[in-house]
Amino acid sequence: MASEGDPGVGSGDSDFVVVANRLPIDMERLPDGSTSFKRSPGGLVTALEPLLRKRHGAWIGWAGIPDSAEDPIEDDGLQLYPVSLSADDVADYYEGFSNATLWPLYHDLIVKPIYHRKWWDRYVEVNRRFAEATARAAAEGATVWVQDYQLQLVPKMLRMLRPDLTIGFFLHIPFPPVELFMQMPWRTEIIEGLLGADLVGFHLPGGAQNFLYLARRLTGANTSRATVGVRSRFGEVQVGFRTVKVGAFPISIDSDELDGKARNRAVRQRAREIRNELGNPRKILLGVDRLDYTKGINVRLEALSELLEDGRVDSHDTVFVQLATPSRERVQSYIEMREDIERQVGHINGEFGDVGHPIVHYLHRPIPRDELIAFFVAADVMLVTPLRDGMNLVAKEYVACRSDLGGALVLSEFTGAAAELRQAYLANPHHLEGVKDAIEAALNQDPEEGRRRMRALRRQVLAHDVDRWARAFLDALADTRAGAKPVRD
């Protein structure tokens, strides 16, 4: 064990520690210089909150504003440990390496990744700070769960500081094909960073298989050759005397909560009001996305434009609502993408709309949760058309909100969700005619066929919720090390 004062000292009392880029709070700096915060909703914190409470748990992460204090925060019984990031850290580690290098590389090079040594150096430095904060907070023999692409070096760094810990890592975005990942100048360092964990989890078996191959190729480690299955049949990598398990764990949503909220009388009344406000169209198409170039918003707009032009969709009884949450607004590729999307919206409304009757209703702002659920209830067709997406929880949220068995889901084949939601209208977003055909089929589906499809989709989503995902991962993590404490509430 490290000496007194070293980051490796296990002085903390938390038996279960979650490490993520962001804390589960939204913090803002007030005019007088002080700060305030509120809890940010999310499936991850919902799933893990009971475990965090039961096990004296802690959450390590950035509070969301530069140069915030690192004083621990207690929020309704949860212990939060902020990691302070400077404006330069945010620019280089987060906006730079995480979102201009890793994000496009892991999403099939939709936008060209940028490789800067300065960004990489800052990524290493910030990951080390997260590892040191975790080492201080974790009790002897604790379980640590590291989340996502911003922190891929933390497992190895933490292993060096605290070999007594049981460490899991889960990647929430796709893991790229081997030939794409090999472009990364620091490819070996990232693979070795992840191999510091006892369990490395991905959404789909394909990502796990890619990782196993790269571990073998880049580190020379012995790996299992068997096919990885969903929540079963784990791959293995031998790292010295340790065996690292590699598995597939498709993430999900709090489907029971959404199902209950969508049945609420006020929400259903709001859904009727939305239809009235849109002019009581025969069909409402809906898109709900963070404004990101991976989401394929431009694809659905182009498909709709051509369907209107071909007369396959009637402009007088169909509207499309696109809810786009602002994202990464200082990054040039996102600025250009927003301009392109707004240009497409203007073209469609100018070409096919009438005064007082636009075809596309485009909202570029955050939408309150209950309002979003009302949109899900109101929409006849949900359009989820990413060019690449690790899972896409919006597709599952829409299904969870349709207890009436109404509606239809058009879903990109290049989402992780497509592997589970087979009764959706699946489409290749790179094939515009295929997207158009899927939208047309969803708009004109036979009502009984629609109910059959939605019933099957709901069975899948309600049975495989976020709690089941978290338990599957944590049970597998506890099995990796003899004597590890099981994480149970």
From Swiss-Prot:
It catalyses: ADP-alpha-D-glucose + D-glucose 6-phosphate = alpha,alpha-trehalose 6-phosphate + ADP + H(+); CDP-alpha-D-glucose + D-glucose 6-phosphate = alpha,alpha-trehalose 6-phosphate + CDP + H(+); GDP-alpha-D-glucose + D-glucose 6-phosphate = alpha,alpha-trehalose 6-phosphate + GDP + H(+); TDP-alpha-D-glucose + D-glucose 6-phosphate = 5-methyl-UDP + alpha,alpha-trehalose 6-phosphate + H(+). UDP-alpha-D-glucose binds at residues 42-43, 290, 295, 393-397. Homotetramer. Disulfide bonds: none annotated. Pathway: Glycan biosynthesis; trehalose biosynthesis. Keywords: Glycosyltransferase, Transferase. It holds the Pfam family Glyco_transf_20. Belongs to the glycosyltransferase 20 family. The keyword Nucleotide-binding does not apply. The lineage of its organism: Bacteria, Bacillati, Actinomycetota, Actinomycetes, Mycobacteriales. It comes from the Bacteria. GO terms for cellular component: cytosol. Gene3D superfamilies: Glycogen Phosphorylase B. GO terms for molecular function: alpha,alpha-trehalose-phosphate synthase (GDP-forming) activity; alpha,alpha-trehalose-phosphate synthase (UDP-forming) activity; trehalose-phosphatase activity. InterPro entries: Glyco_trans_20 (IPR001830). It is an enzyme of class 2 (transferase). One of its GO terms (biological process) is trehalose biosynthetic process. Probably involved in the osmoprotection via the biosynthesis of trehalose and in the production of glycogen and alpha-glucan via the TreS-Pep2 branch involved in the biosynthesis of maltose-1-phosphate (M1P). Catalyzes the transfer of glucose from UDP-glucose (UDP-Glc) to D-glucose 6-phosphate (Glc-6-P) to form trehalose-6-phosphate. Probably also able to use ADP-Glc, CDP-Glc, GDP-Glc and TDP-Glc as glucosyl donors. The record marks 103, 173 as: Involved in alpha anomer selectivity. D-glucose 6-phosphate binds at residues 22, 94, 148, 328. This is Trehalose-6-phosphate synthase.
